[in-house]
Amino acid sequence: GQKQRVAIARALLRDPRILILDDALASVDTLTEERILMGLLPVMRGRTTILISHRVSTVRQADRIVVLDHGRIVEQGSHAELVANGGYYADLYQKQLLEEELEAI
């Protein structure tokens, strides 16, 4: 987790117009991930940010989510739209919610 936070801080120091975070939060727990994302929200405003993640919780707040399966775009939209559609993203979201609940027990 510490390594990822340092990498994010270094990227932010450069003040890029486009910020790309490629699974940058994969090795932190969901609570730490949420704290980091809340801290990043003000930084992401006003710039293009591309979040690449296997966790739905990481991309939930994104304006637009593009879902890939085996390298192909299978869905795109907001979190609410994708969950309502009941497709691949919705299935992944439900599985990850269940995993989080089981971890909390």
Model-predicted segments: where are they?
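ABC ATPase nucleotide-binding domain signature region
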Residues: 3-6, 33
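Catalytic Walker B motif of ABC-type/P-loop ATPase nucleotide-binding domains
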Residues: 19-23
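Conserved catalytic loops of ABC-family nucleotide-binding domains
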Residues: 42-51, 59
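C-terminal portion of ABC ATPase nucleotide-binding domains
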Residues: 31, 38, 60-105
